[in-house]
Amino acid sequence: METKFGVHSEVGQLRKVMVCAPGRAHQRLTPSNCDALLFDDVLWVDNAKRDHFDFMTKMRDRGVEVVEMHNLLAETVAVPEGKKWILDNQVVPNQIGLGLVDEVRSYLEGLSNRDLAETLIGGLSTHEFPESIGGEQLELIRDAAGVNEYLLPPLPNTLYTRDTTCWIYGGVTQNPLYWPARHEETILTTSIYKFHPDFAGKVNVWWGDPTKDWGLATLEGGDVMPIGKGNVLIGMSERTSRQAISQLAATLFEKGAAERVIVAAMPKLRAAMHLDTVFTFADRDCVLLYPDIVNGIEAFSYRPDGKGGVELHKDKGTFVETVRDALGLKKMRVVETGGNAYMRERTQWDSGANLVCASPGVVYAYDRNTYTNTLLRKEGIEVITIIGAELGRGRGGGHCMTCPIIRDAVDY
C-alpha cells in the first residue's frame, strides 16, 4: 500500500508527530501507586501541562504538525466502529470483573466522545462509577479494594507516545509492551490508526496486534530507530526482548521494509530502559550518548538469509562504529553526556541523552542538563530547551514524548 505516512530517518525534517498531553491519568498518581504506574514521583500536573504545551508550541514553530492523542481518540470514538472495537477489547471480564461488564459498557457508551476519550486514558475508578448502576457488587468492591481500585486503569505513560507504536520507514508496528501497567495503551493507539478518518485504510502495519497474547515477545518504540539506508537499530533492553526483535526482523525483511536490523544488547536497568535513553542522534553524522552504558553495548545484526528466514552475526568494532559503517559515513561525531561520573549519572537519570530532532542539527532537550547541552552547542548543534522538572518524572525526554508519523529521509 502506498502511504504518505512513514519515518525514514532519525534526523530528517520532522513533518508530523503524535504526542499525549498530561491530564487526568497524572492526577491519579499518588506516592503509594506511582511505582506500579512506572513513575518515580507524583507530578505537579498543572506545570506538566504548561511545559508540555510549550514543547508542542516549539515543535509547531519549526513547521511540525503536532497531533494530540486525547483529541485523536475523541475523533476515533466518534466513528461507531471505532468505539465498538475499543469497548469490545477494553470492557472485558479480565479487566472489569464478572458482574459489571454490561453496566460499565452501558455507562461508557453514554459518555460524550471527549469524556470517553478522557476516561479511556485517565481511567475509571470504582468510586467514580455511579452507585445507581453498579449496585451491590460495586459497593462490595469499594469496601474490599479501597480508592486505588479501577474498573479501567489510568494510563499515565501515554505521555511517552514513542513506545506503543513505532513507524519504521513506510509502515508501523503495534507493540506488545513489557509492563502490565502499559498493556492497554496499544489498544488505544491501534484504534486511532484503524478507525480515525485521517488514518483508516491508509496505514501499513508491519507487525503486532494488541488483541493477541505475545508471551515473552515484547517491543517498545524507545528501542527502535529507523536510521536510513535500510537499517533499523533496535535495543535489546529491559523492555524489548530478543523474541520480539527476531520476529520483527523477519517480518521487515519479508515485506521489503528493511535490509538490516542492528541489535544493541543492553543491560536491563531502569535508568537505561530503552536505547533512546542512552543513545540518540543530533545530526546526520552526530550522536549523543551515555558512555557508561553505550561503550559496553555489543552489536549484532540480522539480515535476510535468502531463503525466507534470517541470519544473525556479531558485528565487529564498537556499537558506534557499527552504526557509522551502516550509514556509509567516514566519521561519526560523538558527544558524550558530560561531567564526572556523578554528573553523568545524574544527567542520564534526567534524560540528558534523550534528544529528538526537528531537522538535521536541530534538537529538543531538557533544560536542566546544562553541561551536556553546552557540549552539543559547541559541536554546532542548535539546542531548543524544554522544561523537564515535571515531564521527566517517568524517566523520559523529548524522544520518548514524541511518536513521529512523518519524517523525511536523509541523504547519506
From Swiss-Prot:
InterPro entries per the UniProt record, alphabetical: Arg_deiminase
Pathway of action: Amino-acid degradation; L-arginine degradation via ADI pathway; carbamoyl phosphate from L-arginine: step 1/2
Any one biological process term the GO annotation gives: arginine deiminase pathway
Catalytic reactions on record: L-arginine + H2O = L-citrulline + NH4(+)
Protein location: Cytoplasm
Domain of life according to the entry: Bacteria
EC number, as in UniProt: 3.5.3.6
MF term (GO), any: arginine deiminase activity
SUPFAM superfamilies: Pentein
Keywords: Arginine metabolism, Cytoplasm, Hydrolase
Pfam family membership, one: ADI
GO cellular component terms, A-Z: cytoplasm
Primary location group: cytoplasm
Active site: C400 (amidino-cysteine intermediate)
Family: Belongs to the arginine deiminase family.
Xref: NCBIfam families: PRK01388.1
Protein name: Arginine deiminase
Gene: arcA
